[in-house]
Amino acid sequence: MQQDYCPDIAKLAEGGFNKVFILRAKNGREVIARIPTPIAGPAHYTTASEVATMDFLRAVLKLPVPEVFAYSTTSENPVGAEYILMERVEGESLSSRWLSLTTDEVKDIMIQIAEMERKIFDFRFPAYGSLYHKKDLDWKHQIPIVEDFVIGPVSSREFWHGERSKTEIDRGPCRVSPLSTFPFILGFLEKEPTGTGLIIAVGLSPLDCVTSAARREMAVIQRHAKPQPRQTFLLPTNYNIHPSEHTSLLSQFLQVAPHLIRPGSYSAPTLRHPDLSLSNILLAPGTSKIISIIDWQGATILPRFMQAGYPAFCHHDSSQPQSLEIPSLPDDFDKMGIDEQRQIKAIFRLEEANLYYTAATGVHNEEHMNVLKIPHLGMQQYLLRQTGYPWDADVINLRAALVGITTPSVWSKISSAACPVEFSEEEREAAIAESQEWNESEQLLSRVREHLNIDLEGGTEPDNFERAVEGNRQLRIEMVRQAEAGQQEICWRNWPYKDQEDNSMPPQR
């Protein structure tokens, strides 16, 4: 842009973690400016890691990602914020074409995705963490890979938000030591041609990765958490729940964790896109050719069994085996109304995506398919996610996940060792019942979001704002009206889409 200064600036999009602008120069050239929001993660690491990840994928693995022209990992610049200037890719999002694609085009796209993922799976990273350019990290916190790329601390926002940024927790990696210093070590060995001979790049072990979220949350809870009532939608309590209930479950998980580790290539450090949604895949206009994969913010390198799974756009139910039956539209599809056709087509396309992604992965990325075959992989990954959620007096899903994984019929497929954690039959039944209530509550809340056309955090498009506000007000009042006697105030107070400062009382029935 320097050749034609003072570009025209227009906002392209704004989400919870980024603001995206188009910069247009007088000569017609356009670039994308991406500015992270304060809640995106640690300012320096978030920007530096996203830039390095895109540069690595483009330069080393030759994958189609936007070219980075310039960036700043500090707000001490004329812009007053961290930023990334990158290529604007002239493509159509997969989301805009999703329901109009032919089956052959869906197959082609799934093959391309599987082949790109294979290139990433095939690269032998020496440790776990996030990618950076060498110049963007202190020398003590980096493991060299290739060219000027290094692995450094995990940039994921979960490890930095709130009190976590001030708490000593494992974020990885790393130290680099002479080979002679460590005759044996749990970790990955990386041979680097240097002036002093071979070195070992030591990152977090697989067990460190599996337990890091639990240990992180235990550290924060022990220092900062206080008893509080559960404020979950439709499942609130009018009594305090003590943080020790959370840490006790995390302690039980730490006993289980060593048995979840998979040997050899199953634990290989693997990079994966953090959110491969339809909107993050760009196609060449009018074709099924993928020309860019965007939004690599928060991408990390973790053990393969933690990274394996279906892309976000598949909405795959990991608790169920993938059907090998070729999906088809109902015989009376042409007689349906437009809205019903759209709903049926969306389900049909989802079934196609799951089937053909599975097939493409089996043919083009055998390493990934082998991991997907791990018994109860979905249950294990679900448990790992639950250990990373912050204290909010809601431990329903963490308890249910532990109960599920330690069920004898499940545990026997995971480990040949005796399960180190036991629950009584009464505890199991109570946990399952509570989890079912939670799921029913979440399904209702999902219908509320769909009705209001809002996202998980209550955000919506500007032209839907007034409608969503009024609809939200009416639904909140209706919920109180239908609440049991004595529950109206709790229901009103725990409505999920209200201002934090809203301390009002419910209207009288």
From Swiss-Prot:
BP terms from Gene Ontology: cell adhesion
InterPro entries: Aminoglycoside_PTrfase, Kinase-like_dom_sf, Mito_inheritance_9
Inducing or repressing factors: Expression is regulated by the hypoxia responsive morphology factor A (hrmA).
Keywords, in A-Z order: Cell adhesion, Virulence
GO cellular component, one term: mitochondrion
Function: Part of the subtelomeric hrmA-associated cluster (HAC) containing genes that alter the hyphal surface (such as reduced total chitin or increased beta-glucan exposure) and perturb inter-hyphal interactions within the developing biofilms, resulting in a loss of vertically aligned polarized growing filaments. Consequently, this hypoxia-typic morphotype (called H-MORPH) with altered biofilm architecture leads to increased hypoxia fitness, increased host inflammation, rapid disease progression, and mortality in a murine model of invasive aspergillosis.
Protein name: Subtelomeric hrmA-associated cluster protein AFUB_078990
Species assigned in the record: Aspergillus fumigatus (strain CBS 144.89 / FGSC A1163 / CEA10) (Neosartorya fumigata)
Lineage, broadest ranks: Eukaryota, Fungi, Dikarya, Ascomycota, Pezizomycotina
